[in-house]
Amino acid sequence: RLFEERYGHPMPDTLTDEVKEFRTQSITGYFDRVTSYAKLIGMENIVCVMLHTLEETSGLAGLAGIDDYGIDPYWFPGKKNNDPYDFVYEASCEAAKKAKALGKRHHIWIQGYSIPAGYEDEIVTAYDAAYDAGARTILSWSYRGGESNTYRSENCERVWQVMGEATARIRGRYFDDIRNEKLKKY
């Protein structure tokens, strides 16, 4: 009904430019309403968008009700020719740039599910890339390598171990950065 009111004809069954535009406007309008209300009652709004939905969700970061904007640059090891460092770094830089331009905080989610056996160390590479790109809130999806899900990693225990190591590594880098800044005055 809304589509027909806006465009003067029923919504087609195929994904046309009008349908894409309507979808984007609908998503943005919905988030604008709910985040504005949440802001009104004193809540903070943090949103994360998937990279493959950026066309439809790119306007969300600019909403007044959004405080923190994040992305999840999942490189899917073994399934694409994505270098995890390059892929995560470039996407994280774009998110940081967008958030900074809008005066928002940002965060990055690192893939911790559907990791094939033997690719677990790419998680460390991805954490480093996000940190090097300026992210300081870096999280992982999913708990324990997704062991209870159909999208579980092949070696969930190893994924969980590496996620902990990667987190400890960037935490150490963070505190080293603080200490090195303090040492500059001596």
Q: PLM features: residue spans?
A:
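Acidic (Asp/Glu)-rich catalytic clusters
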Residues: 59-65, 93-103, 128-134
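Substrate-binding cleft of secreted/luminal carbohydrate-active enzymes
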Residues: 73, 80, 102, 106-186
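Polysaccharide-binding and catalytic clefts of secreted carbohydrate-active enzymes
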Residues: 1-89, 94
